[in-house]
Amino acid sequence: MEDRNRITRLHTLLVVCLVLFAVLLGRMVYLQLWRGDYYAKQSDGNRLRQSRILAPRGIIYDSEGKELVNNLPGYAVVLQKQSSYKPETLQRLSNLLQMPVEEINAKIKASENFYEPIMLKNNLDQQMVTKIEEQRRYMPEVMLSVQPIRNYPYHELAVHALGYVGEVSSYEIEQGLFKNITQGSLVGKAGLEKTYDKYLRGEDGAFMEEVDVAGNVVKHYDSVQPIPGKNLKLTIDYELQKELEAFTDKHLAFLRSSGIAPGARAAAVVAIDPRNGAVRAMVSRPGYDPNWFVHGISSKNWNSINNDPNYPMNNKVITGEYPPGSTFKIVTGSAAFELKKVGLNEPIFDGGFHPMVPTMGNAGGEVLGWLTFIKALAMSDNVYFYELGYRVGIDNIEKYAHIFGFGERTGIDLEGESKGLVASKKVKREIWNEDWRLGDTFNAAIGQGFNLTTPIQLSVMLSIVANGGTKYQPYLVDSIINSDGSLFEKPKRAEGKHIDVSQQTIDYIRMGMSATTQEGGTASYFAGLPKPIAGKTGTAENSHGRDHGLFVAYGPVDDPELVVVCIVEQGGFGSVAAGPIVYKAFEEFFQERGYMPRPDKAAPKKDTIQ
């Protein structure tokens, strides 16, 4: 009986052993056949480490080859990919990087390539690099990676044209807004950095290393070198840009401190070549330092931008929509000449108001008497142009506004351009659901009412006048250059198109604008320049405060090479608020070409660093 029980126990034990063996065998088969790839990756991950070599972004040069944007050497902190991480490691990283653990986990989850380390934070400052190095013995899966850092050496200079870069977001990756991009990469977020990102970004390289359990490198494998991004050569003139920005800031401060315009804190200035549309300078105030975004903008700097009522991040040259004021009289005059509604020397009487709408007259109630076109434009007389508006009619004013480029985007190579608005019966019906009145036509004729324009649109209109009737698409990038200096391509642009306005009409407009800057005109101080300039003042009504001041000009009159448009928000009269900035642009332009001496070229004083 006892032997039988012993045999039974042995049989039971044997069955249990067989079952256990079968389970182990099944598990082994499962791991080998179904989970083999996974554990092979885990094993390789423990000894193989792949890292990206970030491609340096292309350099951005001014028209003369001066570096406006370049790269500096820097560091990023990356995390070796593995199946799980110790909570204390993540917490240590969180404390070091000032990054929530949840954000670190989100980056880990977003990473798809098992062999590629996870980028946690780039553009580290030296203090952060030192702290991480000191803590690495507790975190062997954490590494420092050398990478290029985007650098804007002149800080705010031309920031609204150049833009800035930042780390690509999960949303941008999910939406496919950037091609061939991975988490942790830097991409253009605004300006030319964004428009030409696919050229500037280049192609990242990679290298593979074998490491031991402590993370020490024991073997190097062949690497794939990065391909640098393409370079951009701009049309921007560094010297003109620098002088315009400095003087604009100085002049705005003067307008405020003198009490002339206490609220003058915002402005837009653009200078272009009327012969082809090349932008020579672009200023929008207030501005900001794009370097703030490279290292991850601090809450202090972000609040200083975000809470500023003058919107520093808006490029007012292309997004600001303002009534064109008296600068629009160029359009009204052109329509009247083209439709034979007025003669060049035909006198029209200004008795201080228009008899058909007695409540509408000149600023300050001025009475200028009998006027012909040239004097009316030079004196910026309202009553004269009310009469032209009455003769022409709103439909024709609308037609010629579109001919000169209003109400449509210019096509400049920057994102976010506004279309503006052209006054019309349809627009009033859509906005106010009201019928059109004669007073609306009078307002439209002098650039008020429903008319809205951007400074870049005004520069296109003025270029048409300056060059004799051709409308060009404005642009900032002259050419895209390979890293070896050879030409990659010229950006495609629309060819210049001659507008449907006669040369005679263009000549009449030019005569009136030339008189504006001569004795008796509203901007006679321009007569002090070595070559004659043609200009037009403007005052744009502003329902939220003091009127905006505008000034537009081109020169030299005989052979125009430069068009300048300026608007100073809440600056008051254009001749006082905006005119001096335009004057400075031409002064710098003439000094560069040797037409007048440059004061700062005198012999330097002792102890002066040149």
Please state what every model-predicted region is.
Residues I7, V69, E210-S223, I236, ...:
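Beta-lactam-recognizing serine transpeptidase/beta-lactamase-like catalytic domain environment
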Residues M1-I297, E321, D395-G405, A527-L529, ...:
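Periplasmic/cell-envelope proteins involved in peptidoglycan metabolism and beta-lactam response
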